[in-house]
A protein has these predicted regions:
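Start-of-helix register in tetratricopeptide repeats
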Residues: 354, 387-391, 426, 479, ...
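Short coil turns that delineate tetratricopeptide repeat
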Residues: 350-351, 384-387, 422, 456, ...
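Structural motif corresponding to the intra-repeat A-B loop/turn of tetratricopeptide repeats
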Residues: 366, 403-404, 438, 491, ...
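SAM cofactor-binding core of SAM-dependent methyltransferases
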Residues: 554-589
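Beta-propeller domains
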Residues: 2-330, 428
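"A position-specific structural signal for the A-helix of alpha-solenoid helical repeats
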Residues: 358, 395, 430, 483, ...
């Protein structure tokens, strides 16, 4: 089986590019894009989900708290909510422009099931109209799924039709629209069933039902649109294995095939099962073919969207339409002029931990945190370097922290790193910061102290290096000292906290600018206690004795600011003194 047709394409003149959602809400998953060309414009629709898919692959050493495969939803909203974004794609540069969320507000109703929105939309051009068609499951209390067709204009849904069928079934999904035959879909592949939707009644009726001589090991389920190629109809289907672990946690493996039909809808050729980029979960919703090549859009682990350009000869070879020999898949290097995106070096060697890590860094810097998490987790599962595995696991937790609203998951993922190597301080700092954020100061203080015990175990090993240093944000043990001083203040240890901040400020530790300023601010804000008050015993200490100074028996200003004003005004009387931001009139005024 070819586990990496993207590599096949790259080694034979193809290219791949990420489809980046510019304004990705919270950095959660983007997936399952579709593609269509109408006149001189090529459109792409990208599915955006509010979850991040966590999938521990390979040896599955690092499960989430809910198993090896799970949707990490906001913990205050477990619905699987989808929104769709429409943009225009330049097929030469892969530049994605004019990307906006499709406005569906005209037809939306309050969802009554947990799968919300139109899922896995395929783009369609029927009669020069831009349409999307996917499954919606939020209109019934039991999640009944039906395909829908929506017309889109200027990023707004202007019509929505729900397709009914003659038989009462629970879930209809992944129908493949036939692009040159309006309102027709391939509903099943073996046997091949084609339905046609009456646009007046929105009822789909079977118009073709053909047994096939080919026998596949798994059901062929819908994927891309069905498009014309030479004298054939072609589409990319998906198939899946589903199982449960010994702990009764679900897992799955997705595969794809190219299916080729003749004009009478006989399957005359097909590819072997394949994967796009060697992940267990991938999904294809888009196929466009023109003179410049074959364009396939697909999702990676529900967290990232991609477009693959494949030369015609590669497509024909995979589909069984040609026996032309292709370049060797065992190559692991590209020439510099062959590298067009940060994905290329990964695609050439997808089980290289470092390459997974660097793709994760690229996605993180693009604020695509769910995608970054996928690659950091793969890096952790693949690496043989314990130091790096620890750091990759911290990066996984960091992605969930930045996405937000997943506190319980974040805690468990941090502990994945700590249990892997409990002798390193970085994880304890992140745990201390975690509990401080939750105002659990005693727990935060405890983890900071544990971290300090680990700081000298191995200074070389504990040195975070490379592009992820600023993400993990551990530049030295002084951050643990800071956490201890901060938590002591919130736990009522005022004098101790002041001393700890002061000791840290005057220490020889190499403080970063942000922490230097933060420590200085805390020293100023927390102030000395008892306060520096003035009383008549200090008269002789006044450098400038203003008029009437001898009348002052006591003044409660925190740091002599009242005395300063009188000094500057030479004891002026009968005026008004306004202090903005004052405290108690006698303590800490």
């Amino acid at each position: 089986m070819n586990r990496n047709i993207c590599k096949t394409a790259l080694l034979n003149g193809g290219s791949i590019s990420p489809l980046i959602l510019p304004d990705n809400p919270n950095g959660t998953g983007t997936c399952n894009p579709s593609i269509i060309k109408i006149k001189d414009k090529t459109y792409v629709v990208i599915r955006h989900v509010q979850y991040a898919l966590y999938h521990s692959e390979f040896d599955q050493n690092f499960h989430s708290p809910y198993g090896q495969l799970v949707y990490l939803n906001p913990e205050d909203d477990i619905s699987l909510t989808t929104n769709n974004y429409l943009g225009e794609l330049n097929l030469e540069t892969f530049e994605l422009t004019n990307v906006k969320r499709i406005d569906t507000s005209t037809f939306d109703k309050k969802p009554i099931w947990e799968f919300v929105g139109l899922e896995d939309a395929r783009l369609i051009n029927w009669n020069d109209n831009l349409l999307i068609s996917g499954v919606r499951r939020d209109t019934t209390e039991n999640g009944q799924g039906r395909m829908e067709i929506s017309s889109i204009k200027d990023h707004k849904e202007i019509s929505r039709d729900r397709i009914e069928i003659e038989k009462d079934t629970y879930c209809e999904k992944n129908w493949m629209p036939i692009l040159d035959r309006p309102y027709e879909y391939v509903k099943w592949c073996t046997p091949t069933e084609i339905v046609k939707v009456d646009p007046l009644t929105n009822v789909a009726k079977t118009i073709v039902l053909k047994d096939q001589k080919v026998d596949f090991s798994r059901d062929q389920r819908g994927g891309s649109q069905v498009v014309r190629y030479q004298d054939y109809w072609v589409a990319i289907t998906h198939e899946v294995d589903l199982w449960f672990s010994e702990q009764n946690n679900k897992d799955s493996e997705y595969y794809h095939r190219i299916i080729v039909w003749d004009n009478d809808w006989n399957i005359v050729s097909h590819s072997k099962e394949f994967k796009f980029m060697d992940a267990q979960i991938e999904f294809c919703c888009g196929l466009h073919i023109d003179d410049s090549g074959v364009y396939i859009t697909f999702g990676f682990q529900d967290n990232a969207a991609h477009v693959l350009k494949m030369p015609h000869n590669v497509f024909e070879n995979l589909a069984g339409l040609s026996n032309e020999e292709l370049n060797d898949l065992n190559l692991h290097l590209l020439n510099d002029n062959q590298i067009t995106s940060f994905l290329d070096t990964y695609v050439i060697d997808p089980r290289n931990a470092n390459r997974n890590f660097y793709v994760g860094i690229e996605y993180y810097n693009l604020k695509q945190y769910a995608a970054a998490m996928s690659y950091f987790l793969r890096a952790a599962e693949l690496s043989t370097d314990d130091k790096l595995i620890y750091e990759y696991l911290l990066l996984v937790a960091k992605c969930i922290q930045v996405i937000g609203k997943r506190d319980n998951t974040e805690l468990e993922l941090l502990n994945n790193a700590v249990r892997f190597d409990p002798k390193r301080p970085e994880g304890y700092l992140m745990l201390s910061l975690y509990y401080e954020r939750l105002r659990q100061y005693s727990t935060s203080l405890s983890y900071a102290k544990i971290g300090l015990l680990m700081k000298d175990n191995d200074l070389i090993r504990n040195s975070i290096y490379g592009d992820h240093k600023d993400i993990i944000d551990y530049q030295g043990s002084y951050k643990l000292d800071f956490q201890i001083a901060l938590c002591n203040w919130s736990l009522g240890q005022s004098d101790l906290s002041r001393k700890q901040f002061k000791d840290l400020f005057y220490s020889d530790k190499d403080l970063c600018v942000d922490y230097f300023n933060l420590i200085h601010k805390n020293i100023t804000d927390l102030s000395p206690f008892p306060y520096i008050n003035y009383d008549s015993n200090k008269q002789n200490d006044l450098i400038y004795k203003f008029k009437g100074y001898e009348k002052i028996n006591k003044n409660f200003s925190q740091c002599l600011q009242d005395i300063f004003v009188l000094t500057m005004l030479d004891g002026e009387t009968n005026g008004t003194y306004l202090e903005i931001g004052s405290s108690d009139p006698y303590i800490g005024n």
